[in-house]
């Protein structure tokens, strides 16, 4: 396995809590990629604890929103771990700045592998939290991994749908889909000729005055002191242009209605992305024999990025999330 070089100083975009301990750890997935993570434990905790793995948003790093969720849930009595997915952040994987519906789902399962063998973790009490694009990956992991007893998604993106169909399904005609595939495959040829990948750019900067409101929201998080991080793809030069190509014909939520374990999906009413959670929830409960432990929570007056860090509104319903995990990791 690759030896990672991890930053030891505290370089998160949120303050360090005095209520938890923190240390860097590594683990590997079944493709041999070594992943970097921050492990948070409640101070003075005894015995075997329920554990939660956290990842996302898509293009973010563990020093941003996922770390905030992990640290906060550790303050509330859980052993938690925020990790960088394969090919990004401090984690391994070549080429860089790629995403894969298979490998990134496996990243969540590998996190469960790691947590399951920790001496102070109860392996029967493991949950996951997926934020933004990793919300869809979390549901995909829950559909295949019976060790995951509870799943929370926050401001979820369906990365298969948005890559294939564009925002609001605005690029889903047969001709548009064909032209998208044609363009991406030409890009592959060009990159193979030059031997170098082209980055697509992170959040647009400078920000045009006529940018959609959600792009302005992304800018306010990723490009300012609120959430900027040097290793974040969204804060800097973005994903490889062809890095998300495999999502075009690999629908990650295909088997979500086979999830038996508990699921809480959280979204802001005013989020541009809210349709992802509404539709995913409807598909998840369709013909699913286990619907009593599934819940969709829509929060009024909240936009997509408010659920990254609270948006200055205390928007993240940590009390609700805590109660959900207490109920389902027991």
Q: Could you describe each region identified by the protein language model?
A:
Residues 59-71, 85:
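The serine-hydrolase catalytic nucleophile loop
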Residues 259, 265-267:
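Short beta-strand/loop motif that positions the catalytic acidic residue
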Residues 3-47:
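N-terminal cap/lid segment of alpha/beta-hydrolase-fold proteins
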Residues 48-57:
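Short beta-strand element of the alpha/beta-hydrolase
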Residues 72-92:
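Conserved alpha/beta-hydrolase
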Residues 98-119:
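Alpha/beta-hydrolase active-site loop
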Residues 302-314:
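Catalytic histidine-centered segment of alpha/beta-hydrolase-like enzymes
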